[in-house]
Amino acid sequence: MKSILLIGLGRFGKHVAMHLHNLGHQVMAVDSTEERVNAVLPYVTEAQIGDSTNESFLSSLGIRNFDACIVAIGDNFQSSLETTSLLKELGAKLVVSRASSDVHQKFLLRNGADQVVYPEQQLAKWTAIRFSSNHILDFVNLEGDYDIYEVDLPERWVGMSVGEIDIRKKYGINIIAVRRNGTLDFSVKPETVFKDGNTILVLGQYRELQKCFKI
């Protein structure tokens, strides 16, 4: 369980609060709007109404005590930038800030953000890949050229083993799990045999995935 400071409780921030709650973390939520603060009360440990660009207010929260500080402000980039910078100055261990454009992302990283999340960009990539490909069921966007994909098992692989298809050698794609009857099995070995109805979780580059799975 971690202690999280969440600043900015719009739609994105509220969903972050809900998921952190479901994961069992302690969350202090902050927003300048009382209505937004009240909306997340069922999901957070503590909540405060305040201006996150005010150094005295932020300092009173005990920034150094949090494992991570998430700046989810999406409607005011100036406030997001100032809050990010102040958090770092006050000794935040980890600052994760939301960006809404490539330019915002660069400025946030230069002004104290350890990591930046870009929901619109990430969702756009997910949508483009997921719905333009016949065999990709889901995917997780990682940094760089490599991503994790869940794909349908090609019919020609039914009855074959991981070692026999050897897509790691041919395409640089690693099979990291097999889904059977709705459950993911991560204990994949060279002798693991594929069965009809399986889906597989793979790590690789999209262009190689296209070649391997004829996407």
PLM-predicted stretches and their roles:
Residues 1-215:
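Cytosolic regulatory regions of ion transport systems
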